[in-house]
Amino acid sequence: MKVELPLGDVVDKISILQIKSERIHNADKLKNVHQELTVLKAAWADTDHPSLEELPEWAGLLEVNGKLWTVEDDLRLLEGQQKFDESFVQLARSVYFLNDKRAALKKSINISLGSSLVEEKSYQDYGSGAGSLPD
């Protein structure tokens, strides 16, 4: 099956797979991650688009998706401890802000590369709330 996707979604997916390839240690899971990453990178390389590393948004997606991974890990740890304190609330809120940044990066890729499909979000813009993002 072949499905057309917004280009920003493809780059985002590759960045997530890159992070998974670095952070997952289970050999069976890594095999699947590497297979998917190889297929998507080859498909991207077969286009006329700049390499992933040449995209201005690439480093930003790696950073944001890496932070999301860490936040989700931290949330699951606190959830397991049934610890729903201020730290939990701040981490949970940071997911919205990080996802807003992620959506903006993906949209920037879609626009700059002339993607025929562009994902739109309908969520409220939280604006200056980014100050509460974890480092």
Where are these regions (language model features)?
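Extended, charge-rich alpha-helical interface modules
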Residues: 1-135
